[in-house]
Swiss-Prot record:
Residues 434-490 are annotated as: Subdomain II. L-leucine binds at residues 532, 536, 563, 565, 625, 627. 3-methyl-2-oxobutanoate binds at residues 80, 254, 285, 287. This is 2-isopropylmalate synthase. GO terms for biological process: L-leucine biosynthetic process. The gene is leuA.
Length: 644
């Protein structure tokens, strides 16, 4: 037995640590309704953010009241920050494919590499410059540390580019000052300002390029705010930006250390207090260590930032950078243009997966395989009703559904707006109900099941789902159709209709006669009857051979558009079968024609002189090129299901 097959072996594979149920005392003041207990986790090794860095208390904060109504300036860093985090960094071909995708999507600032640290990155920067691959409205960005020789190499890589952003950085956090640089505040600030002077010096040597500068106090979230401002202001004095040629100050959550509201407070404080703010583009670069990079980016943007750096689908060091797809489509879902084209999310995802050689998770917002899929019965029912309501509203407004305001429960956006279809919106497993079954039968198979039939058939599917490996597995649309056909369309015992001849009434109030050839338990016989329509006449004919059918409800519809469309008919009937049923002997009733009311009501339609003593109420379904044949097949289906 393999580890995957043995829970014990799987548990043992984790080594010495054993999960121990928390059994310590409750915390002081813990309410009686909370039964949780103290764990044995070594929480004493960690401390609150306010103790590790500093408390951030912003008075009169304004960001909680702001509504995001515009897109930030985006910068995609997939080719640098994303690439450096890959198990196998991108080849030149994969880099080029990612770059071309980002350009097509509409990103205007793209960080293309760290050319002073990697020959591959250097060569790629030269390639896209020399091949003229950079559109006129796109600015490439390159990263460098503040060391002079690395800055020189960076400018060499960008020589000949029409426009370029040189992004220089050094870490300013309390922890890195102490354990990495072993330097004081003034010494760390000098690293930044010396780097800025070197950048200005190098830019003068390459006048053919329009240079811009970005500075990041790396590990900003672990840096005191006053000190972060001090360093940025000092760098700004060296660069001397103007409103027309602003500097980018990028404030990265290099490591996410606290809740997004604290990050937002810090961004608003910096936005208020940075010198020469009108000449500064305030940029965010959130990582996802605590799983809240998207929230941090959105709140930080509301707090005064102008620009956001991130990666498609959140690739990046450790838990990744903020996801540009999620940020952009969050805006889109609230009616704000992200100024990026996400209209073919699957092409974007496939390209990213190819370039990164990493899969996008099935649950990743907007792009995962399952994000527009509902398994829950109540969710499926609500989605089904929402889509139907959209269609009805569009018909009433005499417009296309695609022009209607999107309002469908559980789906924040229309999957079709990002290139998905509705095929996978509802999938059925043991958690599903009638809504999901009805949706798939309608969208995949063209059958609009009446509500009570939905309930009946969903019970069939429930049994199949619960029996899938005993674990509540999924039932595919094909498996669902096979089950439906076996349950409603396939049975031919005890009754099978062979053919019929109908003499229709000349007027609406007249009598219709039918002569039909049927098989009863394999024996062919001819039956005849009359009524106020073909269905009533057929019911009357069946009564003469032992099948007492009272039609309780009836539905019909075309399964598609066009002259060659199949018709579907659904009959809910109370059926009593005489035993044994022999032609002309069992179940005979008065020879008066049978009348079926329209609409048929329980107990009224198809009733004969003597009420049945015992009966089964069942649904029958018929599908045929003509609605008459479909309705007769539905009656036969009901009889055969009642005989089970």
């Amino acid at each position: 037995m393999t580890t995957s097959e043995s829970p014990d072996a799987y548990t043992e594979s984790f080594g010495a640590h054993t999960i121990v149920k928390p059994a310590g005392p409750p915390r002081v003041g813990q309410p009686s309704w909370n039964p949780q207990r103290a764990s044995s986790m070594p929480v004493n090794r960690y401390r609150p953010f306010a103790e590790e860095v500093e408390p951030i208390r912003l008075r009169n904060r304004t960001w909680p009241d702001r509504v995001i109504d515009r897109a930030p300036l985006w910068c995609a860093v997939d080719l640098r920050d994303g690439n450096q985090a890959l198990i196998d960094p991108m080849s030149p071909a994969r880099k080029r494919r990612m770059f071309d995708l980002l350009v097509r999507m509409g990103y205007k600032e793209i960080e293309v590499g760290f050319p002073s640290a990697s020959q591959t990155d250097f060569d790629f920067v030269r390639e896209i410059i020399e091949q003229g691959a950079i559109p006129d409205d796109v600015t490439i960005q390159v990263l460098t540390q503040c060391r002079p020789e690395l800055i020189e190499r960076t400018f060499q890589a960008c020589s000949g580019a029409p426009r370029a952003i040189v992004h220089f950085y050094n870490s300013t956090s309390i922890l890195q000052r102490r354990v990495v640089f072993r330097a004081n505040r003034a010494e760390v600030q000098a690293i930044a300002t010396d780097g800025a002077r070197k950048c200005v010096e190098q830019a003068a040597k390459y006048p053919g390029t329009q240079w811009r500068f970005e500075y990041s106090p790396e590990s900003y979230t672990g840096t005191e705010l006053e000190y972060a401002k001090q360093v940025c202001d000092a760098v700004g004095e060296v660069i001397a930006p103007t409103p027309e040629r602003p500097i980018i100050f990028n404030l990265p959550a290099t490591v996410e250390m606290t809740t997004p509201n604290v990050y937002a407070d810090s961004i608003e404080w910096m936005s208020r207090n940075l010198a020469n703010r009108e000449s500064v583009i305030l940029s965010l670069h959130p990582h996802n260590d605590r799983g809240t990079a998207v929230a941090a980016a959105e709140l930080g943007f509301a707090a005064g930032a102008d620009r956001i750096e991130g990666c498609l689908f959140g690739n990046g060091e450790r838990t990744g950078n903020v996801c540009l797809v999620t940020l952009g489509l969050n805006l889109f879902s609230r009616g704000v243009d992200p100024q990026i084209d996400f209209s073919n999310i699957d092409e974007i995802r496939r390209t990213v997966e190819y370039c990164n050689q990493l899969p996008v998770h099935e649950r990743h917002p907007y792009g995962g395989d399952l994000v527009y899929t509902a398994f829950s019965g109540s969710h499926q029912d609500a989605i089904n009703k929402g889509l139907d309501a959209m269609k009805l509203d569009a018909d009433a407004a005499d417009c296309d559904v695609d022009d209607m305001l999107w309002q469908v429960p559980y789906l924040p956006i229309d999957p079709r707006d990002v290139g998905r279809t509705y095929e996978a919106v509802i999938r059925v497993n043991s958690q599903s109900g009638k809504g999901g079954v009805a949706y798939i039968m309608k969208t995949d198979h063209g059958l609009s099941l009446p509500r009570r039939l939905q309930i009946e058939f969903s019970q069939v599917i429930q049994k199949i789902a619960e029996g899938t490996a005993g674990e509540g597995g999924e039932v595919s649309p094909k498996e669902m159709w096979d089950a439906f056909a076996e349950e409603y369309l396939a049975p031919v015992r005890p009754l099978e209709r062979i053919r019929q001849h109908v003499d229709a009434a000349d007027d609406d109030g007249g009598t219709t006669s039918i002569t039909a050839t049927v098989k009863i338990n394999g024996v062919e016989t001819e039956i005849s009857g009359s009524g106020n329509g073909p269905l009533a006449a057929f019911v009357h004919a069946l009564a003469d051979v032992g099948f007492d059918v009272a039609v309780l409800d009836y539905y019909e519809h075309a399964m598609s558009a066009g002259d060659d469309a199949q018709a579907a008919a659904y009959v809910e009937a109370s059926v009593t079968i005489a035993s044994p049923a022999q032609p002309g002997e069992a179940g005979r009733h008065a020879s008066d024609p049978v009348t079926i009311a329209s609409p048929a009501q329980p107990g009224e339609a198809g009733r004969h002189a003597s009420d049945p003593v015992t009966s089964k109420t069942v649904w029958g379904v018929g599908i045929a090129p003509s609605i008459t044949t479909a309705s007769l097949r539905a009656v036969v289906s009901a009889v055969n299901r009642a005989a089970r």
